[in-house]
Amino acid sequence: MLITQLKAKEAITSLTAGKKVFIINCHGCKEVRFPEKEAARLQKELAAEGNVTGIMTTDYICNPENMELRLKKHMSKIQEADLVLVFSCGVGVQTVSEYLEDKMVCAACDTYPVPGFQGVTPLEYKCDQCGECYLNQTGGICPITACSKSLVNGQCGGSKNGKCEVDSEMECGWERIYRRLKEIGRLDALKCPTQIHNFATDDELK
């Protein structure tokens, strides 16, 4: 199972301030605990500001074919928006980001793991369920899974010709992130301080 938890309200409003926003809710996998009431309350507050171009609630946006069919019905409202805010697990956010190449796509939730079935996650998108989602700083490409070293503060010095030094068949995750941020005009995100990933266990935090 997965648990999705809303990011801090301040973190979300800092992304949406002064922007037109299209919102996507995923109520898909029964294996995912989604904070519906909290999400609805926050979305109502955002809509009250008059900057929400539309809200789409669907299921299984981690399935690219299903997601594409659903999004096509809302494309005019999506094109009006400066930012697409996705309330889902990390895989859903990555799937939407890959499809909407010219849009800034942001995660409204962090994802946490619970042992058990993991839903219908396609293999080409991965979420490590780290509870500290970095997708908003990396253009919707997860540095934890796209980089073989799970680096969150930029490229290492070992990549060569765009390939990873650990796996020469693997494209450098941070080169992908750079290209994506350049494409959506967000290279400034690379200058922002990075919250280093916390690998401490629950027992160590007690």
Model-derived features: positions:
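Iron-sulfur (Fe-S) cluster-binding modules
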Residues: 1-62, 71-84, 97-137, 141-206
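N-terminal glycine-rich "phosphate-gripper" loop used for MgATP/nucleotide binding
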Residues: 86-90
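Short, well-ordered alpha-helical microsegments
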Residues: 92-95
